[in-house]
Amino acid sequence: VLALDYRWSNEQQFQTTREWAEECFGKHGLPYAIALHAPDPDGDPRNWHAHVMSSYRPMTRVGPNEWEVAEALRTDLDNPRSMQLLRENFARAMTRMSREAGQCERHTALSHAARGLPVEPQQHLGEARTRKARSGEYVAAN
């Protein structure tokens, strides 16, 4: 799941996500699918995000709805360093689109801790507890 800038058009959001996915997966012959998600009607209206699904098994399109699927996985790309590179590449893609959109914001792949920010990690509430919190009910978390 990739957080996107809510001020951008859907085209800009999709373009940023597609360029990132092509750089990280497509150029290695790996398939990917992108879905842009609008914020939940009851949630934060800034929560535009993309879901990206990929595989480490290379695929080549050989016809309409027809793919040649490799037998071997790209295990060389499935490691902690590659996960960090995914984050770094997305930060660069977000920064590039920010400049194109005239915002000139710089995005980073660094965690809050690595940036020296005193922010405690929060617990994921899940759908049921989020619904309770939004309705004004007390939820013992964060």
Q: Where are each of the predicted segments found?
A:
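Broad gene-expression machinery/nucleic-acid interaction feature
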Residues: G29-P31, N47-H51
